[in-house]
Amino acid sequence: AEVDSLWQTDRLISKEPFLECMSVMAGLAGTTKKIKFGMNVASLGLRDPLQTAKQCATIDYLSEGRLLPAFGLGSNRSRDFIASGTSTKARGQRMNEALEIMNRLWTQEDVTFKGKYFEYEKASIMPRPVQVPLPLWIGGSSDAAIERTAKFATGWQGSFETPEEARVIVDKIQSATIKHGRSIDSDHFGTGFGVRFGSWDEEPVKKMAADFEKRTGKEAVRGFVVGGADEILTRIQSYADCGVSKFILRPTGTGDADMQEQTEQIIEEVLSKTSHLRSTP
């Protein structure tokens, strides 16, 4: 196995360095030739669908079809909503409208849409995406997110679910797609988690865990694997046994040198040993 895609976290407000994800995608489109890339995940609760559809189409065009757009609601605990004065109420309904608008803009000559939250009159974008259809990954585990994924997505991207929780969601999505006369490939179910070669007793890890729990309201063990290659591979296999086969591994570190070392360890000690892993639908 090898690195086949790069993913950028979406976070507008942060005291730590976080590059804006759509800008990073555009940069990767111009500086890489083969590798795919996506956002993990971009919050549609904070974005205008016309502008976002145009950005995605442009990036896919510039990269000759290598964009993997992924969207979610954004946490209602996120400082991005508070700082921007954006309400978290009805963000699921707004996202549903946005997804319909974006899908239509990517495939139709012009789009007229009159919804509760968005209205467009004969909107069109050119050039449209190179990929037809443009892959669309959606995150979330609520009943509404499952329905949203079944209706619009080509893949599902989990976040802080346990392997067994992920299995239940995968099954529900697969069942729901039938209702919409669609299907999602069995290998288009993924998840992501932070990775740290080290110990939970390290001060940077303690801070990382505290920040995560404050931001998400969930235990850090749900979002991170800390230890060695065996612990990371065990977590990957646990998800694979539950029907999840795509993994976004996020190295965590304190500074560029540490991040580089952690990334190299993932490639050398983890990815080199994953070729035998197989997901179980």
Locations of regions flagged by a protein language model:
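Active-site-adjacent structural elements that line small-molecule/cofactor binding pockets in enzymes
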Residues: A1-P281
